[in-house]
């Protein structure tokens, strides 16, 4: 027998159970079912910005958490959700029950569900629920250190055009100083990207508290005249290898953004290279990144630097009229 609890607040015991479930799913599938953003909501609370749906089953050891879903709620946008079911409790209809629960709580804005890794079971579940493929996020990778199967990438030097170098300087992010200006530029750079562009000061500060945060790998290009941030490249290091290695740390192009006023200046490419050189100098063997498959300029840039497609995450959805 199963029971689904819907809440926006998790107890310490529920937090521990969800994190353990997420780890079990990642170990079984080789890919995380819950994103970094969702895990931050688990640890710090949704605080009115989302809902948790927890699926419990009665087992010999008592009631246990067998699955969970989280729906991120943003004004004017469809709910953005993820679903995870414990490996030992699959094929019991829990995934479909969680999807139905998500849909029951979605309003007129609709529902979007992310399937990380584009695995066959997720495709089948989406089809059974009448969900359509709407978007894909590519995961690309680049070898920074040569291996038997992949030679090390050759990285050009991150040189600004002379006229751009006269106007901007590239330095590292200053915690406690740059937050508000970075949020301004991030919102402008990602005005058409709701997940990234809507980041708040609280979201940023939560990431600053994460073990992986390192301001020495967070590069900002600052307008010498106005002091405004013209662009940035935030890098990240995954100590667990992120599925690319057997536990050896790898790097990530976490996010690159350029203010619309500076687009076309070559600043994005230079900032990307600055971060890649930083990650290579740390001795990391690989670097990965995520990019929307429809973002052709970004895909072209990353391919020109030697990145190749590795995996993809797929967004499925439907609108309320399709119930």
UniProtKB/Swiss-Prot annotation:
Alphabetized UniProt keyword annotations: Acyltransferase, Repeat, Transferase
PROSITE patterns named among the record's database cross-references: GNAT
Gene Ontology molecular function: any one: mycothiol synthase activity
Known EC number: 2.3.1.189
Enzyme class: transferase
Binding site for 1D-myo-inositol 2-(L-cysteinylamino)-2-deoxy-alpha-D-glucopyranoside: 36, 195, 236, 252, 290
Binding site for acetyl-CoA 2: 256-258, 263-269, 295-300
Chemical reaction(s) catalysed: 1D-myo-inositol 2-(L-cysteinylamino)-2-deoxy-alpha-D-glucopyranoside + acetyl-CoA = mycothiol + CoA + H(+)
Keyword Acyltransferase: yes
Function of the protein: Catalyzes the transfer of acetyl from acetyl-CoA to desacetylmycothiol (Cys-GlcN-Ins) to form mycothiol.
Family statement: Belongs to the acetyltransferase family. MshD subfamily.
Record protein name field: Mycothiol acetyltransferase
Gene: mshD
